[in-house]
């Protein structure tokens, strides 16, 4: 144990990192925070990616997680009207089966709400064009034409949970924004630490395109032409 700690401190002193990007999973994350504290590295200079941003990543670390930052595509907490609506119409009505109500508003719980919004609205978008009965390719079209502007988010009660979304054939992300959140170990809750921030799309998209082109070539997949309406809306998948 002593040797391992000495080695960790040696790495810290030799590399002298300003920040450390944490790309952990499961128990790796709280262990990283506890190790940072033991070696004198500020946990406030650990920045977690989306696999290191949940309540389950910080709570096991206890006080060692205080001040830890993580990126998130959606803030934690009861940040949107739709969350209050779910609490009122589902849980207070005795219809929910969530055993631990403290999970309401947690990172993964809010992600589930957001997934429900996206899937439902994409299905409705497809049904508006093709009718009530849709196949998988038509649902894909619904996702590729999903528009959630401010008025739509307001109507859904999702304002504050996610930025405006505009998914297309060319852009399956639909918005390249994220926020940073910081953990308050005393209150056991995340607090938003930034506005919506756009990543370096030019850099990331080039990497995505390169990987996609290779995958298509290796698997004999014909690339769709999103500028060609007939090819873009080809439903014979």
For each predicted feature, which ranges?
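Single conserved hydrophobic/aromatic residue that forms the stacking wall/gate
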Residues: 1-11
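Stable alpha-helical elements in mature extracytoplasmic
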Residues: 8, 28-32, 79-87, 115, ...
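Sequence contexts marking disulfide-bonded cysteines in secreted/extracellular proteins
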Residues: 11, 168-170, 225-231
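Periplasmic-binding protein-like
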Residues: 15-26, 32, 43-49, 108
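Catalytic-loop motifs flanking and including active-site residues across diverse enzymes
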Residues: 25-28, 111-119, 176, 212
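Extracellular/periplasmic periplasmic-binding protein-like sensory domains
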Residues: 35-116
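Segments of small-molecule ligand-sensing domains
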Residues: 97-109, 120-193, 199
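Conserved C-terminal helix/tail region of periplasmic/extracytoplasmic solute-binding proteins
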Residues: 141-154, 184-237
